[in-house]
Regions:
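Middle-to-C-terminal accessory/interaction subdomains
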Residues: 1, 15-19, 54, 71, ...
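Conserved ATP-binding subdomain of kinase catalytic cores across diverse folds
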Residues: 1-131
Length: 315
């Protein structure tokens, strides 16, 4: 099967000759950038992604949405097309991707990877009829998921129109990353969210210059009408924000957090302004230019893909 593959450059204890073992190459053509805007050219953690549930359709839907969203306040993963051979046998067309990990955070922000924690929603709770999806440890420093769960409980039980309550949340959570995450996913109608596919990271170092939780853009494969049930007629904004008579359209931690935050007028106005302005950033010219470039990268390879995986449509 053409499955996604995680790649680790380890050496002996991730060291070789006293140096950490990395791939030293500008794999993403300058698209992966550090905090100074310089290309990241050294990697110890990578992902060869098959494009998930989109693997039999475009094969790069998530990579495309992440690429055009780069430069916003929510973290994204760079990508490039790759021909994969395993033991000399052609295995297919994949997407080389960065991977959300402590190493990713260190590369992009300069934080010490040994003090970074990455958490994610607990996918095991998704089938609960009334899901209350707790967050669990993902990678890096363990034991911080409950800290974020407690933040959610605070938002649930405190009036965030009260300045001191909102100020506390604002000191713990990168609200700009949350706003841009919501705006991007609504723009692309990227469902299987907000109840799922949520990841955050933070630097736990006591002397960290920024110890807030930061949202990342993760797994948008269902976006742009991939599934018939997620076409343009599906109003993700309504699902995300609607709350009436004590009932959420979709009852999950993120919708409850947004409802609580919108009690603060400044946050609410900022969220609405971003939802309104994002189409100017993601305009048709920008979207078409990036799409044409990514299609041109992959189109010559798709005949090889179809020959290798004839039952997988054109992926």
């Amino acid at each position: 099967a053409r499955r996604s593959l995680r790649i680790y450059y380890k050496g002996a204890n991730n060291q070789e000759g006293g140096m950490e073992s990395d791939l030293n190459y500008d794999l993403f053509g300058g698209l992966a950038k550090d905090r100074n805007g310089q290309a990241i050219t050294s990697f110890s953690r990578l992902l060869l992604r098959n494009s998930g549930q989109d693997s039999y359709l475009s094969g790069f839907r998530d990579a495309y949405m992440q690429r055009v969203s780069a430069g916003l306040c929510v973290d994204t993963m760079a990508s490039s097309a790759a021909l994969v051979f395993i033991n000399g046998e052609f295995w297919g067309v994949y997407n080389f991707r960065e991977r959300y990990s402590p190493e990713y955070v260190s590369d992009h922000t300069g934080a010490n990877k040994d003090t970074v924690t990455v958490i994610e929603n607990d996918a095991n709770n998704l089938n609960n009829p009334n899901p209350d999806v707790a967050f669990v440890d993902g990678s890096g420093v363990a034991g911080y998921a409950d800290e974020f769960n407690w933040l959610l409980e605070f938002a649930d039980t405190h009036d965030l129109s009260v300045p001191k309550n909102f100020a506390w949340i604002e000191s713990k959570l990168d609200l700009d990353s949350l706003i841009d995450l919501c705006a991007v996913r609504v723009f692309f109608n990227a469902t299987d969210w907000p109840e799922n596919n949520i990841k955050l990271w933070r630097d736990t170092a006591p002397d960290s210059a920024d110890a807030r939780w930061h949202f990342v853009l993760s797994d948008t494969d269902w976006g742009m009408g991939m599934k018939q049930t997620t076409g343009p007629e599906r109003n993700l904004l309504f699902i995300l924000l609607n709350y009436s008579n004590g009932t959420y359209t979709k009852d999950c931690p993120l919708t409850r957090l947004l409802h609580a935050l919108r009690a603060n007028r400044t946050f609410d106005e900022k969220l609405i302004a971003r939802l309104w302005s994002l189409p100017g950033y993601l305009n048709a010219d920008r979207l078409n230019e990036e799409l044409d470039q990514m299609v041109a990268e992959r189109e010559p390879l798709m005949g090889l893909q179809a020959d290798r995986w004839p039952k997988d449509n054109l992926s």
